[in-house]
Amino acid sequence: MRIFPLLRVALPLLALASPAAAQNIGESEIIVTGSRISRPNLGSEDAITVDRPPAIGLKRVADFAVQQVTIVGDTRDEKKRREEIFEMARKAIELAGKRGGIELATGQLVVEPLTLANYRNLEIAEDDDREDVEQVSFLVKTRLAAGMDAKAALERIEAFVEAVPAVGRAEMEKAGDLTLSVVGPDKFRAAIVDLVAADAKAMALRLGPAYAVQANGLDRPVEWTRASLTEVYLYVPYSYSVVPAR
């Protein structure tokens, strides 16, 4: 608990505040979309409902730009079609290992590496509109180096996609828009809490000595949303209460 003049921060032991599953998520690489993300596995009795991200949080450049891709095959023979799809996935993994700045992964929320050891676990999806068409999907990502904008990141990813050798009738193509990922959002908790505490202290000073500002919810897990083409906004879903000073 950090105590300031005219400020009370409700802050239980952070290490004990979150379920283990939520803590594990916060230590992983996380996909960040344009929508506010609430962590799974949080009981409703513990949750603080926030319609939109609070005003105080940490905006920073994401760790990776991420693009979903698909490998689509339409060879009539099912066995051959699937072999072509997986062979192209294998070639993509090998090419990523040779080219600098490109990594392959899977996951909708938590990002996991796609490797030669696990690529055949990719789920095969059938095309609802076309017979004898199947596909697999995964992620192509590139680290957002200092000064790199979204256009440069996308161009690097597109160049990689175009460079992957086709196999039979299998083809690789982009799917959807460029998104972002952040590695270990929980490591930014202390910086976020410091920002909230400083804002609460400043608010309390403006209110005068008769009142204090209490910041609630700082024991909640870090949450995230997209802030710009290359930036993420990390925050704790806190709320303020104005109470009589003691």
Indicate where each model-derived feature is located.
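N-terminal signal peptide c-region/cleavage motif recognized by signal peptidases
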Residues: 17-19
